[in-house]
Amino acid sequence: MVFFPHRHLLGIKGLSHQDITLLLDKADEAVKISRQREKKTSTLRGLTQINLFFEASTRTQSSFELAGKRLGADVMNMSVGNSSVKKGETLIDTAMTLNAMRPDVLVVRHSSAGAAALLAQKVACSVVNAGDGQHEHPTQALLDALTIRRAKGELSGITVAICGDVLHSRVARSNIILLNQMGARVRVVAPATLLPSGIRDMSVEVFNDMKEGLKNADVVMMLRLQRERMSGSFVPSVREYFHYYGLDAEKLKAAKEDALVMHPGPMNRGVEIASEVADGPQSVIESQVEMGVAVRMAVMETLLVSQNQGERV
């Protein structure tokens, strides 16, 4: 058996090929559990998971909650809107308060990059990063990798085109790191205004034209246009953005005939993706949601078994 050497999951950066493979293999087992009639196990019975979301996210929070409950953990969702944070309590104060409750794992989403890492320094339990600013979203990258691997058989050697608002996307960053680590070829496709500085140093091919970027791709991963994170005008108009960078059936023809269409959600239909593609036969968007629960089950079990029992997983 292989030992998982990490106490926290703060990002994909720092995970080895072996670490990622271990989590994906364990997530494959979790898929089987989730498809059974009796979905609940006792793996984490007696352990406590706190979901601390400073940014609203129905999908991700629900996925983490379901993952914990399927493993038998006691799960508490902390509503920041009604918490002491709104009354002026700092992130560190919140961390110390929660630490005193002696949870076993803290799942945190925050608008500031590095928030999860900061909490990990202040609490005795494991910390899972559910998204921190524009930095990373590790479980999203893992669920995307699992979706691709189950559909294509492997990650090594495939070509993945990540398209859209790369600048503001923690999903893009985590996926680029993971896919490179696993031997995939990664392209990013976006207007120059939505590309971060230094993107060419991340071992990716950069395209400003959709059809060129999608040419013979095995996977087309669309990103949400994150207008809430934009302080200026990054695109002339939504209509023009869709014309040049929205994925429709015509643009998709540039990719391989059996290319997968992915989106981390929530989708802006008619902005970065057309309904005909999102709901089409090449779409694996619903599968991504299913794989999300499985991956988060795998992460929770791997971290908590390692931390609390010192077992090899």
Curated annotation (Swiss-Prot):
Keywords: Pyrimidine biosynthesis, Transferase. Transmembrane segments: none annotated. It comes from the Bacteria. GO terms for biological process: 'de novo' pyrimidine nucleobase biosynthetic process; 'de novo' UMP biosynthetic process; amino acid metabolic process. Its EC number is 2.1.3.2. PROSITE patterns: CARBAMOYLTRANSFERASE. GO terms for cellular component: cytosol. One of its GO terms (molecular function) is aspartate carbamoyltransferase activity. It catalyses: carbamoyl phosphate + L-aspartate = N-carbamoyl-L-aspartate + phosphate + H(+). It is an enzyme of class 2 (transferase). The keyword Transferase applies. L-aspartate binds at K87, R170, R224. Coiled coil: none annotated. InterPro entries: Asp/Orn_carbamoyltranf_P-bd (IPR006132), Asp/Orn_carbamoylTrfase (IPR006130), Asp/Orn_carbamoylTrfase_sf (IPR036901), Asp_carbamoyltransf (IPR002082), Asp_carbamoyltransf_Asp/Orn-bd (IPR006131). Carbamoyl phosphate binds at R59, T60, R109, H137, Q140, G265, P266. The keyword Transferase applies. It holds the Pfam family OTCace_N. HAMAP family: Asp_carb_tr (MF_00001). Catalyzes the condensation of carbamoyl phosphate and aspartate to form carbamoyl aspartate and inorganic phosphate, the committed step in the de novo pyrimidine nucleotide biosynthesis pathway. Belongs to the aspartate/ornithine carbamoyltransferase superfamily. ATCase family. This is Aspartate carbamoyltransferase catalytic subunit. It comes from Agrobacterium fabrum (strain C58 / ATCC 33970). The gene is pyrB.
